[in-house]
C-alpha cells in the first residue's frame, strides 16, 4: 500500500481560534450574540505561533444596521484593550498600513480600511491637534504589482517618519467555511502577509521594525481543501440529523433545515461504512490527504463568496470607523 508522507504538508490557518487554543484562553464572553475570545500565548506554546495577545471576535452578520452597530461597539472595545496590552500611550504616533492587493477584491480589505481613516500627521507637523492622535497611512500594495517587498517599503517609511507603533490590516485565509467574513482577529504579534495561502512574504513585526505591530485581519478566502473537507463533514452531520429526526419515513426530505448547529454526528463505524477508510481519518489528516490530491495538479484553488465586493466594503467601513474612535478622543 502506498504510504503518504504527511509531515511535509503544513496546512495552516491564520486564525488562532482555529488552532488548539483552549489551554491559553484567558477570557471568553458573549454580548449581543457576538463571541469574544482572548488568548495569550507564551514563547514556547505548542501552537507554534508567535508569543503575544490574540483577540477573536465572532459573529453571524454585519450587513444590517443593528448587527453592524453591535460589532462596531465590541471591536472598538477590543481595540482599546489591545492598545492597553501593548502599552500604547495616548500621544504615541501610529502608522496604519493597508496590506494586500487592491486589484483583487478578497485581498483589498486593507485598501478599503484606509479610505476612511482620519489622517492627521500633516496637521501635527504644523501644530498639535487637540483630541486627535498623530496618524499616517500607507498602502504598500503587493510584490507582483510594485516589484518591491511590502516589508522593504514599510521599513523605509518607518525609518523616515518614525511612528511609535504600527497597525496593519490584511485579509486572512480561514480553515473552515463558517469562519469566512464572520470573524475579526486582533493581535499584537505582527503579521506575515500571504502566509495563509502559502505565499509567504517578509513578516511585519516588532522583531523586524523595532516598534509594536498590531494586526487586524478578516478571513475572506478558503482553499479547495477546506471546501472538500467541510462538505464531507456536512454530509455526515446531515445524514445524522435526518436519521435522528426520522426523515427516512417521509416522502420528501426538507432540504432547507439547518443541521449545522446539531451536536450529534455519525459514529466512527457509521462514517467508515459511508466513506470507507476516509471516514476514519481525523480532520487534520484528511485535510493533508486532500492537499496531496489537489496541490500537485494545480486544483487547490483559493475561493471566496459571491458577495465579497459588498462584504469587503462593509468590513472596510467597520474597521476604519472603529480605528477612528479608538485611536482618537472622539
Where are each of the predicted segments found?
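N-terminal amphipathic/basic leader segments beginning at the initiator methionine
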Residues: 1-51
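An N-terminal, well-structured beta->alpha segment
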Residues: 42-89
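Short glycine-rich or small-residue beta-strand-to-loop segments that form or flank ligand, phosphate
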Residues: 58-60, 93-104, 137-141
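A glycine- and small-aliphatic-rich helix-loop capping segment at beta-alpha/alpha-beta transitions
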Residues: 78-81, 105-122, 183-192
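Gly/Ser/Thr-rich loops at beta-strand to alpha-helix junctions
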Residues: 99-107, 144, 171-175
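Anionic-ligand anchoring segments at beta-strand to alpha-helix junctions in alpha/beta enzyme folds, i.e.
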Residues: 109-143
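A structural-propensity feature for long, helix-poor, extended segments
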Residues: 130-158, 162
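A structural signal for small-residue-enriched, beta-sheet-centric alpha/beta enzyme cores
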Residues: 138-139, 168-328
Amino acid at each position: 500500500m502506498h504510504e503518504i508522507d504527511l509531515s511535509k504538508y503544513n496546512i495552516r490557518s491564520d486564525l488562532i481560534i482555529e488552532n488548539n487554543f483552549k489551554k491559553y484562553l484567558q477570557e471568553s464572553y458573549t454580548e449581543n450574540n457576538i463571541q469574544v475570545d482572548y488568548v495569550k500565548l507564551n514563547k514556547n506554546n505548542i501552537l507554534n505561533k508567535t508569543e503575544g495577545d490574540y483577540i477573536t471576535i465572532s459573529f453571524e452578520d454585519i450587513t444590517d444596521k443593528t448587527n453592524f452597530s453591535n460589532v462596531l461597539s465590541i471591536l472598538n472595545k477590543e481595540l482599546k484593550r489591545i492598545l492597553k496590552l501593548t502599552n500604547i500611550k495616548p500621544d504615541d504616533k501610529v502608522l496604519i498600513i493597508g496590506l494586500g492587493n487592491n486589484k483583487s477584491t478578497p485581498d483589498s480589505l486593507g485598501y478599503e480600511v484606509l479610505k476612511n481613516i482620519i489622517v492627521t500627521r500633516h496637521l501635527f507637523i504644523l501644530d498639535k491637534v487637540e483630541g486627535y492622535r498623530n496618524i499616517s497611512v500607507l498602502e504598500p500594495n503587493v510584490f507582483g504589482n510594485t516589484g518591491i517587498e511590502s516589508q522593504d517599503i514599510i521599513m523605509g517609511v518607518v525609518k523616515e517618519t518614525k511612528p511609535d507603533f504600527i497597525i496593519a490590516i490584511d485579509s486572512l485565509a480561514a480553515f473552515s467555511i463558517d469562519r469566512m467574513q464572520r470573524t475579526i482577529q486582533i493581535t499584537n504579534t505582527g503579521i506575515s502577509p500571504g502566509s495563509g495561502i502559502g505565499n509567504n512574504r517578509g513578516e511585519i513585526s516588532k522583531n523586524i521594525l523595532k516598534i509594536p505591530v498590531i494586526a487586524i485581519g478578516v478571513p475572506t478566502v478558503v482553499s479547495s481543501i477546506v471546501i472538500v473537507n467541510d462538505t464531507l463533514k456536512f454530509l455526515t452531520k446531515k445524514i445524522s440529523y435526518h436519521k435522528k429526526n426520522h426523515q427516512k419515513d417521509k416522502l420528501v426530505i426538507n432540504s432547507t433545515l439547518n443541521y449545522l448547529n446539531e451536536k450529534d454526528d455519525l459514529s466512527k463505524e457509521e462514517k467508515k461504512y459511508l466513506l470507507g477508510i476516509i471516514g476514519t481519518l481525523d480532520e487534520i489528516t484528511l485535510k493533508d490527504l486532500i492537499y496531496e490530491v489537489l496541490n500537485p495538479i494545480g486544483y487547490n484553488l483559493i475561493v471566496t463568496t459571491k458577495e465579497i465586493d459588498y462584504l469587503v466594503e462593509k468590513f472596510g467601513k467597520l474597521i476604519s470607523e472603529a480605528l477612528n474612535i479608538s485611536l482618537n478622543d472622539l
